[in-house]
Curated annotation (Swiss-Prot):
This is UvrABC system protein C. It comes from Jannaschia sp. (strain CCS1). Keywords: Cytoplasm, DNA damage, DNA excision, DNA repair, Excision nuclease, SOS response. Belongs to the UvrC family. The keyword DNA repair applies.
Amino acid sequence: MKNETEAVADQPPKTGPVKPGHEVIADYVRTLDMSPGVYRMLDSQSRVLYVGKARALKRRVASYAKPSGHSPRIARMIRDTASMMFLTTRTETEALLLEQNLIKQLKPKFNVLLRDDKSFPNILVSDEHAFPQIKKHRGSKKEKGSYFGPFASAGAVNRTLNQLQKVFLLRNCTDAVFESRTRPCLLYQIKRCSGPCVGHISEEDYGASVKDAVRFLKGDSTDLQRQLADGMAAASEAMEFERAAALRDRIRALTNVQSAQGINPQGVKEADVIALHMEGGQACVQVFFIRANQNWGNRDFYPRVGADIEEPEVLEAFLGQFYDQKEPPKQLLLSHPVESMDLMVDALSGKRGTKVEILVPQRGEKAELVDGARRNARESLGRKMAETQAQGKLLDGLAGAFGLDGPPKRVEVYDNSHIQGAHAVGAMIVAGPEGYLKSQYRKFNIKGGSLTPGDDFGMMKEVLTRRFARLLKEDPDRETEAWPDLLLIDGGAGQISAVKEIMDDLGVDDVPFIGVAKGIDRDQGKEEFYRPGQPVFALKRNDPVLYFVQRMRDEAHRFAIGAHRAKRSKAVSATPLDDVPGVGAGRKRALLAHFGSAKAVARANLSDLTAVDGVSEGLAQKIYDFFHDQA
């Protein structure tokens, strides 16, 4: 929002001795008016405790100025408040949007916080090629084509793509691979592709298959089946038995796909079904994605809540943060009403550009969908609480085995991956009381040009130096949860000696670290543990703590290998076009599709280059000069 907010009363009124929180707040109330806006409560270290919105700032903030009558959570928040900040807005809807944006940015201690907010994958049917590709897509929708989603997970997308390939025989290869084929690939042999790369299907027939696939993704499967059945009958009457058999197989495959999808609500075309279950100061929100009358998967979320927060407040905070960077669907079906229903409708409708309907259904098919989501939320939270309890016992055991002061809340495990020093990547995974914190995982592209190929010590030094130098810069007072309580390093005495040197150089002497080595005969179960200045030790083969350490080490190894493969794959697919100024991914695809290879692009003249869609005369000149200046 530009030019629609202004800061007011950011400085507390002049006071003498330190006042209780409710008196500090009362001093601010006298400076406020009845404008809508957002308020922030800060502690004595200027850390944000809470972000809230208000239709009338003066009235809302005044409710905190009472010395009693608050819930335990609010009472603690008021007690810790040393100052406040305010932003006025033109409308309460703007205040809601600003509030949720600040909560995600500042992560205040007393707010409900959505901790896992990754983007969701979509299916893209591209239209930049005569034979469009169908593929999984995540991120901004810059590429031309039709997008379908969101899907709850990559697995849900992959299953749908497999089904579409079975039914419609569409290609999933890249344009560069498509242009380079001289014979059909294995997918053609197993009847998962129609072989357009080698002319086994005409552009017209392939286009018809693409249109059918798009109709299926839009939910028109009943009409599509009827059309295919009519086509099969017409082909039989015309004695085109091969075509009739192909249509029969497509109808069968389409029927199998529909029966395998499970939940397929007929009365709900486009909606997110969102249900909340709270228990023991914890919460689970279950989201089902219904698109084109089909269930495109579900995802569970575990927002940070307090014991005395009510369901409407939790659900409102979840919706605001969940749709902050996502377009909402036409309908939201909720298990509980939210605190500001009309306000949320206005905010989400503004984001979508058309009316968004929010319902709390009590009967019928929609209520059954919500009940199913609520049941899933309850069961998921039960499993999560059991896992957290078991994880807590393992962390207690880890503290006992390694002589820590208490169970670690954040364990960081480090590993490197490379092939003789090439495409080297460092990896960090994070574990805590709630299991693996995958949103906290980090990969480090090794930049050390002076490193000897395969120098694991040098790679570890670079990774840890970058990690802790950043921590020291961003959080020198250890105020956030980003600082680890324990480091696990893949390696023995040499690695631990190198780590100690790094930590000494950085002045970090309060983070314990342990080296994990596989022992003299490299057998799993005979791991040896190294601590600086102490004897090597081992755990019993059947010790649950040993299995726990092995799982964390294996997870770090898996993540490191995945990062290494991605880096290597990117390097393999690199071409000289990557270095041409003004040529991004889209124009690179267009050039390769038109010419077939980077070498052909390098040989092209200016008129050939300008014939490519999206290549202007100026860019064509840059491309031509780039390759001919190098010649």
